[in-house]
C-alpha cells in the first residue's frame, strides 16, 4: 500500500508551496514572467487570462487556505469580484463595523439599488442569525477592523449554509495561521495579500480562495473581464514575502500580546481591544476556535481626537501611517478618515504591531502617549 504524502504544517507550506518543478538545474524560485503574449495552444492564451508568476503565488496561498485560489490587483478588487457575481437586488448581511472600504462599497451598491444591505453587529450571534432570513450573501470580517470584534465563525457558517446562503470571510487579520474558514464550511475566503502574506509594505494585492468550482469560474471571469489582474512583479514579491510569513506573524503576535498587556495598565489609555487579553470581551469566543489572537491592538486614548493625533505624530519607531501587516509597526487614529464608521470611537488608535524589539516599541509608545497630553 502506497504511503500518503505527509500533511505539512503552515511553516513548511509557506516555504515549499509555489515552487517550480524540481529537475536538474531547475530554478529554486519562480521566475518573474513579464509576458502579455503567449504562443497559441497552451493553457494561458493571453496575459489577462493567466501568468506563471500569478499561478505560483496562487498555489502558495491555496496550500495555506485549503482552497483553489485567484490573485487580484488589490484586496478591494478581490472583494469587488465577489459582489459582482451577485444578482441585482441580492440581500447582503455584513458587519456594521469593519473595513471602511467594504462598508463604503456596500453603501454605494445599496444606493444604486444593485444590492440591499443589512449591517449587523457581527459579534452578536443571535442578531446575525436573525438577519439571515432571505439573505443571499453573508460577508464576515473577523476579527473586525479596527474594533477587533470576533464572529462565532463555526456557528454562523453552519447556520448560513443550512439556508443555502453564500458565505465569504475576510481572513486578513487572522490569516490561515489562526483560522481556516473553508474548513468550517465557508464558500470564499478573501485575503488582502498586501498585509501579512506579503508583509513588507511594498505591494498591493488581494486573493480569493474557494473549493466551489462554480464560484471559482465566476470569480475568475470577474477578474478576467474586469481586468483586475495582478502584476507579475507584485506577485513575485508577495510570494517571496510568504516564505517568512509564519515567522513574521508569530513575532508580531508575541509583541502585540505584550504591548496589549502594558497598554491596559497605562493611565493614559482608557480601553484596550485585543482578543488575547483574558479581560477582553471577545477573548472566550476567539479562544474557542482560533489558534491565536493576531498582531493588531486597538486602544482608546484618554484625551481628545487632536491629542490622539499628536500621539501618533510623536512616535519615532512606530510609523504614523495607514495599513497594517508589515514588518514595521504602524499606527493611526482611525476616525481621521471620513469614511470610517461613526461607531468607532474618536480617540481609537489602531496599532499594527511589527517585528521590532518589543522594549524599543514600548519605550517609543510610552513617550508618544505622554507627548499627547
Question: Locations of the language-model features?
Answer:
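A common structural junction motif
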Residues: 226-227, 314-325, 368-373
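Conserved PLP-enzyme active-site core in the AAT-like
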Residues: 2-7, 16, 20, 69-268
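N-terminal glycine-rich, Lys/His-bearing helix-loop that initiates the first secondary-structure elements
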Residues: 1-45
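PLP-dependent enzyme catalytic core of the Aspartate aminotransferase-like
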Residues: 107, 248, 313, 329-373
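Short hydrophobic/aromatic beta-strand micro-patches
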Residues: 209, 298-300, 352-354
Amino acid at each position: 500500500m502506497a504511503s500518503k504524502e505527509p500533511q505539512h504544517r503552515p511553516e513548511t507550506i509557506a516555504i515549499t508551496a509555489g515552487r517550480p518543478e524540481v529537475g536538474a538545474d531547475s530554478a529554486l524560485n519562480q521566475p518573474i514572467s513579464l509576458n502579455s503574449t503567449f504562443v497559441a495552444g497552451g493553457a494561458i492564451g493571453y496575459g489577462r487570462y493567466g501568468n506563471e508568476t500569478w499561478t505560483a503565488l496562487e498555489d502558495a496561498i491555496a496550500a495555506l487556505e485549503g482552497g483553489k485560489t485567484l490573485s487580484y490587483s488589490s484586496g478591494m478588487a478581490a472583494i469587488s469580484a465577489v459582489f459582482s457575481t451577485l444578482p441585482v437586488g441580492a440581500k447582503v448581511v455584513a458587519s456594521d463595523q469593519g473595513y471602511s472600504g467594504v462598508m463604503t462599497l456596500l453603501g454605494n451598491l445599496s444606493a444604486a439599488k444593485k444590492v440591499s444591505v443589512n449591517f449587523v453587529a457581527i459579534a452578536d450571534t443571535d442578531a446575525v442569525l436573525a438577519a439571515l432570513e432571505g439573505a443571499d450573501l453573508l460577508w464576515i470580517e473577523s476579527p473586525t477592523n479596527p474594533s477587533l470584534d470576533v464572529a462565532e465563525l463555526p456557528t454562523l457558517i453552519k447556520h448560513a449554509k443550512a439556508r443555502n446562503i453564500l458565505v465569504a470571510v475576510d481572513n486578513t487579520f487572522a490569516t490561515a495561521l489562526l483560522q481556516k474558514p473553508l474548513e468550517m464550511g465557508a464558500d470564499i475566503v478573501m485575503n488582502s495579500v498586501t498585509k501579512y502574506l506579503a508583509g513588507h509594505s511594498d505591494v498591493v494585492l488581494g486573493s480569493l480562495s474557494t473549493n466551489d468550482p462554480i464560484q471559482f469560474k465566476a470569480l475568475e471571469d470577474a477578474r478576467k473581464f474586469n481586468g483586475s489582474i495582478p502584476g507579475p512583479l507584485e506577485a513575485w514579491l508577495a510570494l517571496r514575502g510568504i516564505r517568512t510569513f509564519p515567522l513574521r506573524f508569530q513575532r508580531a503576535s508575541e509583541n502585540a500580546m505584550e504591548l496589549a498587556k502594558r497598554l491596559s495598565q497605562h493611565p493614559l489609555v482608557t480601553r484596550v481591544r485585543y482578543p488575547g487579553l483574558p479581560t477582553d470581551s471577545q477573548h472566550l469566543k476567539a479562544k474557542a476556535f482560533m489558534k491565536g489572537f493576531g498582531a493588531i491592538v486597538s486602544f482608546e486614548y484618554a484625551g481628545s481626537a487632536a491629542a490622539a493625533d499628536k500621539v501618533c505624530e510623536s512616535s519615532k519607531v512606530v510609523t504614523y501611517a495607514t495599513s497594517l501587516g508589515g514588518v514595521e509597526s504602524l499606527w493611526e487614529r482611525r476616525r481621521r478618515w471620513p469614511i470610517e464608521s461613526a461607531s468607532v470611537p474618536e480617540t481609537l488608535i489602531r496599532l499594527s504591531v511589527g517585528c521590532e524589539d518589543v522594549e524599543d516599541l514600548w519605550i517609543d509608545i510610552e513617550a508618544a502617549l505622554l507627548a499627547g497630553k
